[in-house]
């Protein structure tokens, strides 16, 4: 059976995942490449109801109030439902799928809740559960958009003001976001993710500049 390819954009909150995912999709459309675009969590869908409760602070006001394994399962079920409903058949028949967040997000945001010594065990469980037991595809390529936490904090506060939206419990917790970034760099190295340094001399690189770096790697993958 001809399996497809799955490209994932990962990074802490405010790192530009949605923007880079969109730019890649626009570029692929221009190049006449067929793809399917997905993003997680799927707010508003029944399968994401528990995720919404968690991020809204209904299970605890702080990320650490909900243990890493419990929180991960909520996100896993949403991904599984999405795979069955939206993109599994397309992927299994050789399709190209572009994802804004994936299993990789639990590796970034949930493993960071655990002491260093327990993170490895958690990652083995997470990947074994989703890619092994649930049968979700393993990504072909993961871009880790690396942005210093002080920059993402500023960008997120600006976004909240501009869009009049409140931060969820992850976004509102600066110490937690710093922990996520530290953890993410370790996970990216362990899992062979493509790290994209999104700043230069403390300033954000232009989004087109970052896109060109991303696109060069995608082209190499697609051949």
What are these regions (language model features)?
Residues 17:
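Conserved lysine of the Walker
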Residues 31-134:
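ATP-dependent small-molecule kinase phosphotransfer cores
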Residues 3-6:
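Pre-Walker A (Motif I) flank of P-loop NTPase domains
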Residues 9:
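Hydrophobic anchor at the beta1->P-loop junction of P-loop NTPases
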Residues 14:
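Walker A (P-loop) phosphate-binding loop of P-loop NTPases
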Residues 25, 150-223:
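NTP-dependent small-molecule kinase module
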Residues 104-182:
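A glycine- and Lys/Arg-enriched "phosphate-lid" helix/loop adjacent to the NTP-binding pocket
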Residues 20:
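Hydrophobic positions on the alpha1 helix immediately C-terminal to the Walker A/P-loop
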């Amino acid at each position: 059976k001809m399996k497809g390819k799955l490209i994932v954009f990962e990074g802490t909150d405010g790192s530009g995942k949605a923007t880079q995912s969109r730019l890649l999709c626009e570029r692929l459309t221009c190049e006449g490449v067929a793809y399917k675009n997905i993003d997680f969590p799927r707010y508003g869908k029944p399968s994401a109801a528990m995720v919404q409760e968690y991020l809204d602070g209904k299970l605890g006001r702080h990320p650490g109030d909900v243990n890493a394994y419990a929180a991960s399962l909520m996100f896993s079920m949403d991904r599984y439902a999405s795979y069955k409903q939206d993109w599994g058949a397309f992927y299994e028949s050789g399709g190209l799928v572009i994802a804004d967040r994936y299993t990789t997000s639990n590796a970034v945001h949930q493993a960071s809740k655990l002491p260093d010594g327990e993170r490895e065990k958690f990652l083995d469980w997470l990947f074994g559960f989703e890619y092994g037991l649930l049968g979700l595809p393993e990504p072909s390529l993961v871009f880790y958009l690396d942005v210093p936490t002080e920059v993402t904090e500023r960008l997120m506060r600006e976004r909240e003001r501009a869009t009049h939206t409140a931060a969820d419990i992850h976004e509102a917790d600066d110490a937690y976001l710093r922990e996520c970034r530290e953890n993410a760099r370790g996970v990216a190295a362990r899992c062979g993710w493509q790290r994209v340094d999104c700043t230069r001399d403390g300033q954000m690189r232009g989004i087109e500049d970052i896109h060109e770096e991303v696109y060069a790697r995608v082209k190499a993958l697609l051949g």
